[in-house]
Amino acid sequence: MRIHVFNPEHDLALASNLDNFTAPHAGRELRHDLGFLPALWAGEGEGVLVEDRSAAEYAFGKLGLPLKGSFVTPDELPQLVSDPSFSLQPWGWDRAVRGEFLRLGAPAQGLPDDSYLNFVRQTSHRSWAAEHLLRPLRKVQGTVGEAETGRTLSEVRRFLSVRHHIVLKAPWSSSGRGVRYVSDGTDGAASTFGFTPQLQGWVEHVINRQGAILMEPYYNKVMDFGMEWHCDGKGNVRYCGLSLFKTLKGAYTGNLLADEEEKREKMGQYLNLSILDDVKQKIQELLLTSISNVYCGYLGVDMMIVNTGDSLCVHPCVEMNLRMTMGWVALHLHEISTKPWSDMRISFKNGRYGLELGMKQ
């Protein structure tokens, strides 16, 4: 039996690199409340791990979609993992989710080994995408983007003195929590974004814990978007589609649900679509030569349209998420839906996270 697991703490688990990792409270809440999500794609005879079966059935039932798989709870897992047909499909692979199932009695031979998990972790480091994707993608005409790795506080200060308004990112972080905006004031940005003692402490903490910090110029963003992909681990890469999404303070809030042509039409209002096609082709080439023979699963490359003052350009790799993404969920929802949904949103109401679907007017 294949068991699906929504582990949104994945990015933080990569940072810890521990077999026994306890996520922060917000991450545990997200997993508890949205644990039903894999039921959207789980097939017949497959299970979806949730902490509260009744809550999961209620949340999924509100979507009005047929449930093909079944919800399973932690107390049922020891029996399920002993079945010879057991396999695990998490949101993202890390030592913590493997350790969780090893402690439940899952056979080690059915789970990824250290070599694979180390590959996922190192390739998920923001500096990997900056070096292996962003740098070669910048050769595509109509693109913009720069990212450097800082390993000392003085390197961060030096980058700020040159760029004046910058974005600092922890190498492994999730949904905006590891991102800080900084200005030295010379560009007219609010002084509240200055290099305060609190920010200095955060920078030193990130460097001490993760070994480095990513430094980028601040860009005047017009639109967030991404491209979703799948690698089969055998040298093949498949393009899944465009993801048009929204963020608030760097944290994901929702996705447009539409077919590819409608999304391209929206983006065509801002730029020449040939730029998108060139970026797409280049990413496929880069993924083929770098990870396609090892990584098996979905991944997303986040991008944005940027106003440089002179023109609108594409930042072709803000980050790469080597895991399932909400962008892929949106693509899948649009594919399976028979209803005129317009968008998908992650909400937080009455102390609980939820998935909301908006209808076209």
Indicate residue ranges for each PLM-predicted region.
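N-terminal-proximal low-complexity accessory segments that begin disordered
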Residues: 1-49
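Conserved N-proximal alpha/beta basic substrate-recognition cap immediately N-terminal to
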Residues: 28-41, 49-159, 174
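C-terminal amphipathic "assembly/sorting" segment characterized by alternating charged
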Residues: 44-50, 341-361
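Glycine-rich phosphate-binding loop of ATP-grasp-fold ATP-dependent ligases
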Residues: 147, 165-199, 225-226, 250-267
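Phosphate-binding site of ATP-dependent enzymes
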Residues: 164, 195-253, 305-317
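ATP-dependent carboxylate/phosphate-activation module, predominantly the ATP-grasp catalytic core
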Residues: 229-285, 321-347
